[in-house]
């Protein structure tokens, strides 16, 4: 992993304090970069010492293509994939991932497949569901879950349970960043991990060492991005 301090990115706080980022390069592909901010960040399920900004990877053509190509190497030759379930706005990566998995190659188990790319919906109770028009792409299918970030694993686990409820067989979980190597026995392959970020801490809100030390929360984070406080 390469940290580049000479490529700053900045978030401006309401109180006048700026937060500068360092650029983190993936050890699996030098073309893949994310911006990493240090501070006190709160998500729905966890408090984290760093915020990994993966906006470019989800929305830039070249970066999304490179991310998909790198992730595809984990599934191309021994994991059948009929459907990719995309979370957190990862549909662009998902489309490229389907393309790379379906490439015509001698040893690829997914060669020339017409792979589906779908996104689940949240109902009024916050439960993940698939509408009737999408369920044929899940029922009895081999499914790969694509998620931007795995911290506590709760979102990945909910998606896993949802796919299994609809009769899908989860083959794996692909992520841009993951704290975990597996969720309920399903392996997680990621482009970045906590080992790439010195001092990275992720904990439940009740056990957050930064809260206990009286450190104020810098920003709220979710799959759409960051809101500075």
Residue ranges of each PLM-predicted region?
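Short, Lys/Arg-enriched N-terminal segments with co-localized hydrophobic residues
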Residues: 1-18
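Conserved acetyl-CoA-binding loop-helix of GNAT-fold acetyltransferases
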Residues: 154-160
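Short, glycine/charge-rich flexible loops or terminal/linker lids adjacent to PRPP-binding catalytic cores
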Residues: 91-144, 151-154
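PRPP-dependent phosphoribosyltransferase catalytic core
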Residues: 17-28, 160-229
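Short glycine-rich phosphate-binding loop at a beta-alpha junction
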Residues: 80-90
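Conserved acidic residues
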Residues: 82, 141, 171
């Amino acid at each position: 992993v390469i940290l580049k301090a000479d490529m700053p990115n900045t978030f401006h706080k309401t109180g006048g304090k700026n937060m500068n980022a360092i650029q983190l390069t993936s050890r699996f592909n030098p073309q893949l970069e994310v911006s990493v901010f240090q501070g006190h960040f709160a998500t729905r399920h966890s408090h984290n010492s760093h915020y990994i900004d993966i906006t470019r990877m989800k929305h830039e053509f070249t970066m999304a293509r490179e991310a998909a190509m790198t992730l595809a190497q984990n599934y191309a030759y021994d994991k059948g994939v009929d459907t990719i379930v995309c979370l957190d706005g990862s549909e662009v990566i998902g489309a490229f991932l389907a393309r790379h998995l379906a490439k015509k190659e001698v040893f690829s188990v997914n060669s020339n497949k017409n792979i589906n790319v779908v996104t689940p919906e949240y109902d009024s109770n916050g439960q993940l569901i698939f509408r009737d028009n999408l369920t044929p792409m899940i029922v009895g299918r081999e499914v790969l879950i694509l998620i931007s970030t795995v911290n506590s694993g709760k979102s990945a686990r909910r998606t896993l349970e949802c796919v299994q409820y609809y009769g899908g067989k989860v083959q794996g979980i692909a992520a841009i960043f993951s704290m975990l190597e597996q969720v309920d026995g399903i392996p997680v392959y990621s482009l970045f991990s906590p080992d790439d970020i010195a001092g990275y801490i992720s904990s439940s809100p009740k056990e957050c060492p930064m809260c206990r030390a009286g450190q104020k929360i810098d920003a709220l984070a979710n799959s759409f991005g960051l809101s500075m406080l």
